[in-house]
């Protein structure tokens, strides 16, 4: 299968004043596991606007803005937000994404079925702007 270059720019912008320099580490391990279903339910208010994905969690007023070059990988972006919501809830277990579950939109299924991303980690620093760029070929 042709390799796809994926570029994800992740911005984390906490809205709660006073919570600065609080480190939060999110480990995203993407495997074929149905655990992703329950975790994704923690993500609310998924809004697509101008090619960007806005996700708000119930854990606090933090929202995650993800700019995606290829809109067909929106499901992967929502998985990042789900992992972040899981971290905010106090659970530090690895996040598993079921590649056969439609997390966000139907047109993302072809990418999810074709790609298995294992062991990808993102580090989030709450209270500060973080720009994380990922260039990763996926077969």
Regions found by a protein language model. Give the residues of each.
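C-terminal/domain-edge helix-coil "capping" segments
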Residues: 91-139
């Amino acid at each position: 299968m042709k390799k796809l270059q994926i570029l994800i720019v992740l911005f984390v912008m906490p809205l709660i004043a006073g919570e600065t320099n609080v480190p939060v580490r999110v480990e995203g391990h993407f495997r074929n596991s149905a655990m992703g279903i329950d975790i994704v339910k923690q993500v609310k208010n998924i809004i697509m606007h101008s090619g960007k994905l806005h996700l708000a969690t119930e854990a606090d007023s933090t929202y995650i803005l993800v700019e995606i070059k290829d809109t067909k990988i929106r499901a992967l972006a929502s998985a990042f937000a789900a992992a972040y919501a899981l971290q905010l809830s106090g659970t530090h277990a690895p996040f598993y994404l079921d590649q056969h579950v439609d997390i966000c939109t139907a047109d993302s299924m072809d990418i999810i079925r074709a790609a298995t991303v294992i062991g990808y980690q993102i580090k989030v620093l709450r209270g500060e702007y973080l720009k994380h760029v990922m260039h990763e070929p996926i077969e």
